[in-house]
């Protein structure tokens, strides 16, 4: 067995973090629509989580935000003139498009890509397939820049492969690692990859109220692209009833780490059959199923109990990283303390205040992309993105300089916000040694 570790790459909240309520099916996003946001606080909350976990011995890195508002797409939609004129026209004629191209949703990097560690792949490389995020227009814009960022971070082509997103069609809707779990023993051992989908062609079992964003066809294609050993793959359908209750990704109802699957009793279709399959194929497999009598699906969604991070310590014990909302819900907090006392590897609860992200429907797990790496692979990652004291202080200073502490829907049309964002990303891409990863850098900001 090779030594390997899980490295969490967290998305840095973007400068246009706002509450536009764009995510139908994500009830927190809809509920907080048009509230005033605080991008600077959002960025600091995310950075504090990264630094705390890094200090606790969990390898941690950062993925930068995308350029927003994203002017090239507005030009594709027929708005012309200088960048300032484009902003003015879209704000006056079609403000909904301005909201869409200003979303800071790339911060939820659990949707950036699906990862396959080298120990699981046929060619022995670490593979990642960028998610097309086809179901939501504003998220479907992310794939090209996500690909550029991942190639700048994982730039050793002998060790890493980055695959472009699947074609942008509904049949191949792919939401990345948020619908993917890996189960097994030590990180350096081969694992069982669990791909979770919401719908498939020819199957009438699907939600009726909210969309199922992930298709089985997409999951199968991603497994092929990532060259996952076919003996190490399971495809499972998420329970359509919980999708209709606001569980838009599997990471809102389940989280795995090594041999443990922590999930709600109603997370999967044919759940008992799936768990029996995992017990047969994963040595030491342990399912921690939360009964609906103790935590309802509604409470799981409102607190993001399962949108948590389950992290392994060297001694085999695990820490559960939770949003503040879990501690503030009496029933959920009572259950969690019972969980601590029970016979399972979870020995610590770690709570973070992530309210700015939570109000848009993204908890601790949404903000991170986990990547299993050997020591040699970790050394091959762009070192400038690895979290440490120096980077933490530099990013906090950078955020204080460029991020606003108040942002409303109307502010998105401010040309100064666009200029601030581009200057900030120029500085950040130098700080993180990324090269020219943003379209405005390659086009000189262009006025069309």
Curated annotation (Swiss-Prot):
It comes from Shigella dysenteriae serotype 1 (strain Sd197). It comes from the Bacteria. GO terms for biological process: arginine catabolic process to glutamate; arginine catabolic process to succinate. GO terms for molecular function: N-succinylarginine dihydrolase activity. Belongs to the succinylarginine dihydrolase family. Keywords: Arginine metabolism, Hydrolase. The keyword Magnesium does not apply. It catalyses: N(2)-succinyl-L-arginine + 2 H2O + 2 H(+) = N(2)-succinyl-L-ornithine + 2 NH4(+) + CO2. Catalyzes the hydrolysis of N(2)-succinylarginine into N(2)-succinylornithine, ammonia and CO(2). Substrate binds at residues 20-29, 111, 138-139, 213, 251, 360. Homodimer. It is an enzyme of class 3 (hydrolase). InterPro entries: AstB_sf, SuccinylArg_d-Hdrlase_AstB. Gene3D superfamilies: Succinylarginine dihydrolase. The keyword Repeat does not apply. Coiled coil: none annotated. Its EC number is 3.5.3.23. This is N-succinylarginine dihydrolase. The active site is at 175, 249, 366 (nucleophile). Pfam families: AstB (PF04996). Pathway: Amino-acid degradation; L-arginine degradation via AST pathway; L-glutamate and succinate from L-arginine: step 2/5.
């Amino acid at each position: 067995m090779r030594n390997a570790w899980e490295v969490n790459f967290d998305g840095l909240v973007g400068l246009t973090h706002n509450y536009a309520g764009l995510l139908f099916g994500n009830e927190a996003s809809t509920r907080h629509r048009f509230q005033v946001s605080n991008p600077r606080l959002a960025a600091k909350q995310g950075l504090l989580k990264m630094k705390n976990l890094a200090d606790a011995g969990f390898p941690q890195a950062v993925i930068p935000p995308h350029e927003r508002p994203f002017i090239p797409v507005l030009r594709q939609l027929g708005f012309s003139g200088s960048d300032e004129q484009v902003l003015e026209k879209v704000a006056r004629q079609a403000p909904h498009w301005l909201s869409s191209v200003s979303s800071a949703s790339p911060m939820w990097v659990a949707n950036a890509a699906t990862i396959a560690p080298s120990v699981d792949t046929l060619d022995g490389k670490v593979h990642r397939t960028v998610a097309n995020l086809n179901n939501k227009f504003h998220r479907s814009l992310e794939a090209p820049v996500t690909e550029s960022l991942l190639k700048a971070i994982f730039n050793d082509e002998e060790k890493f492969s980055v695959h472009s997103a699947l074609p942008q069609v509904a049949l191949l809707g792919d939401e990345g690692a948020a619908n993917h779990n890996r189960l097994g023993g030590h990180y350096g051992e081969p694992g069982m990859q669990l791909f979770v989908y919401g719908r498939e062609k020819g199957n009438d079992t699907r939600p009726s109220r909210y969309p199922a964003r992930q298709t089985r066809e997409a999951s199968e294609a991603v497994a092929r692209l990532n060259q996952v050993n076919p003996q190490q793959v399971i495809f499972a359908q998420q329970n359509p009833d919980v999708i209709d209750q606001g569980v838009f990704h599997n990471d809102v109802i389940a989280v795995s780490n090594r041999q443990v699957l922590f999930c709600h009793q109603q997370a999967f279709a044919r759940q008992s059959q799936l768990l029996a399959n995992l017990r047969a194929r994963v040595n030491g497999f342990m399912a921690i199923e939360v009964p609906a009598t103790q935590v309802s699906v509604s409470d799981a969604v409102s607190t993001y109990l399962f949108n948590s991070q389950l992290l392994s310590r060297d001694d085999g014990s695990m820490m559960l990283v939770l949003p503040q909302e879990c501690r503030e819900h009496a029933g959920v907090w009572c259950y969690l303390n019972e969980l601590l006392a029970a016979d399972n590897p979870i020995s610590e609860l770690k709570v973070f205040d992530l309210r700015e992200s939570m109000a848009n429907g993204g908890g601790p797990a949404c903000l991170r992309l986990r990547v299993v790496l050997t020591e040699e692979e970790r050394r091959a990652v762009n070192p400038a993105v690895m979290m440490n004291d120096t980077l933490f202080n530099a990013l906090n200073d950078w955020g204080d300089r460029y991020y606003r502490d108040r942002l409303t829907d109307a502010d998105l049309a401010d040309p100064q916000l666009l200029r601030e964002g581009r200057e900030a990303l120029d500085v950040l891409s130098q700080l993180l040694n990324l090269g020219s990863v943003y379209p405005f850098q390659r086009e000189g900001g262009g006025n069309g």
